[in-house]
Structures are given as C-alpha cells and as structure tokens.
Amino acid sequence: MKVIKTAPLIPSEIKVLEKEGNRIKISLAPFEFGYAVTLAHPIRRLLLLSSVGYAPVGLKIEGVHHEFDSLRGVTEDVSLFIMNLKNIRFIAKALVGQDSPLENQSVVVDYSFKGPMELRARDLNSEHIEIINPEMLLATINEDAQLNFSLIIYKGMGYVPSEITRELMPEGYMPLDGSFTPIKNVVYEIENVLVEGDPNYEKIIFDIETDGQIDPYKAFLSAVKVMSKQLGVFGEKPIANTEYSGDYAQRDDAKDLSAKIESMNLSARCFNCLDKIGIKYVGELVLMSEEELKGVKNMGKKSYDEIAEKLNDLGYPVGTELSLEQRESLKKRLEKLEDKGGND
C-alpha cells in the first residue's frame, strides 16, 4: 500500500563490504531518492580536506644553506633529497591523540648517518617517529661521508604551502610544503535498492584508501563527525555561541565566561584541582578540550563529571567548539581580567 510520507526514511544499515590493508569498501542504505549523492559528495570532500595526518614542514641540513645546494658525499642533491623526503609518510607518536585545532603541534627529530649506505625511510624510525613506507629511498651516502639533518614534523590537515610554513620555522630551517592528508583515494557509487517492494531508494558505496597513517574506517567516521559538527549550527538546539556576530566579548552570555570559577559552586576537591593549575575563570574551562580537562593532575572521573555537568548547565559543554574569532575575543577578555586583577 502506497503512503504519503511526512518524513524521510532514516538509513539503518552500514556494512563493511571489503577490507584489505589500508583500503575499505563501505555501504550505507537505504536513502530516499536524491539523498545519497547529497550526502556522499560532502563526505568525500571532507575525507580529502579534513583528515588529519603528519608531514615534514621544516628541514635543516648541516652545511647546507638553500634547496639548490649539493650534498657533499651524497649522490642526491638537496632538491632531490627534499623530493624523496616528501614521499615518506610519517606518524609522530607524541602527537597521536592530541586534538587542539588552534595550536600548532609539532615534533623535532635529529639524525646523523655515516656512509657508505643507502639511507631509506626505515632508518628514520625512532622513539618519536614511525615510518609507514619503510622501503622508500631517501639518499645514497658515499664512503667517508656523513649526513646530519633535522626535521620538524607537524600534525595538520590538507595542503599547506611553504609560504605559510616559512612563518613557523626557526632560524636555519628550510620551509617545506606540507601535504598532510592521509587519504590516497576516495570514490563513491550510488546504487538503487529495494525497500518493501519500492525500488526508488538508494545506497552509497564508498571506496576509501589511506596511506597507512590512519585506518580508512576511522577516517570515514572522522569525516562524518566533522560534517555533523558543521551542520550542528543549523539544528533545533544549536551548539553554544552559534549566534556570534561582531565582537563576541560584547555578548551577554560572555559575562558567564568571565565569571570566576567560584560562581560554579564546585566541590572543594574540584576547585582545588583547578586552582592548582591556575584556572580562575569559567572561560578558561570552556577553552580547554576534553583531553586537556581530563589530563589535569588529580582530576578523577567524579571531578570531571561534576565540572562537565556545571559547564553543560551554562550552555557550554566540555569541548564546545568556538570559532577562531570567538576564541581570540574570549582570550583577550580573560587577559584584561587578569590585568585588572579579576575586576570587570
């Protein structure tokens, strides 16, 4: 029996069709006619643009002043060395799990190699660095030659040109383009599926391949999460502070964030925990990520849950995503409070 719908069908099926190495095929169904491509295209774009990876963005080689120099005792010149370096895929172990979108996250590693040897990517493995493609050739070092160099590896997403990374480099480092995306390829297909005898429903099949820095299924889930957060601003219950316009510091609810933590009526244990690390204002808590808050010394589960509940009551759940303008405006407001000794 045909019915006139008043709401679209909600997809209920997600299946892993194939999984081999760093490649996966996933199907999602059923979608109303026209919905599949509407969702599949932005998810594909977000996989390519928002997936987080690692890349070298700074290089310092002993005795080298610019990328057109030659390397004494090394077959490859500096340009070829850099090209080979960019083809190596890294994981910076110290940065795994750290998610602070507005702070630079990097690690510096130093290397020294003596010839004769074929320097391959696997030789760069260390307590700080894991190499995904270990057999890549980096350089050929001749007998009696030595190659000393340092790398700055950043965590990031997308592509960042050297004009930008140049501003992050200490003296003596050559800036490199940063190609962070761990996604090698992502395509999708739309197929028709039968639902209760009706063929006018659709299925999305994603084919995702990564370079090994991230599991493809995790990359997919991460992209969906990003999409959900981006769309959250339009929901019936918008995420906190979405009505931002102009100077955030002038908004009425910004006053809540400049209140001292005493106003939250926290237990003595919670208050002491925050006081010991210098947290004075509610806004400082809002600026902290979930990981940062949980990582506070002596912050047990009960204390964390208490703080999370209080922040939620204020309309700022732990991990609330503020825009760059909001964060900067809030930071400036808090700095002014510090300068005034807490009197606003």
Swiss-Prot record:
InterPro entries (UniProt xref):
DNA-dir_RNA_pol_insert, DNA-dir_RNA_pol_RpoA/D/Rpb3, DNA-dir_RpoA, RBP11-like, RNAP_asu_C, RNApol_insert_sf
For this UniProt record, give its keywords in alphabetical order, as a comma-separated list: DNA-directed RNA polymerase, Nucleotidyltransferase, Transcription, Transferase
> What superkingdom does the record give?
Bacteria
Please give the GO cellular component terms listed in this UniProt entry: cytoplasm; DNA-directed RNA polymerase complex
Q: MF terms per GO, please?
A: DNA binding; DNA-directed RNA polymerase activity; protein dimerization activity
* Region Alpha C-terminal domain (alpha-CTD), residue ranges: 253-344
**Known EC number:** 2.7.7.6
- What does the domain comment read? The N-terminal domain is essential for RNAP assembly and basal transcription, whereas the C-terminal domain is involved in interaction with transcriptional regulators and with upstream promoter elements.
As for family, the record states: Belongs to the RNA polymerase alpha chain family.
> Which HAMAP family does the entry link to?
RNApol_bact_RpoA (MF_00059)
The name on file for this protein is: DNA-directed RNA polymerase subunit alpha
Which gene holds the coding sequence for this protein?
rpoA
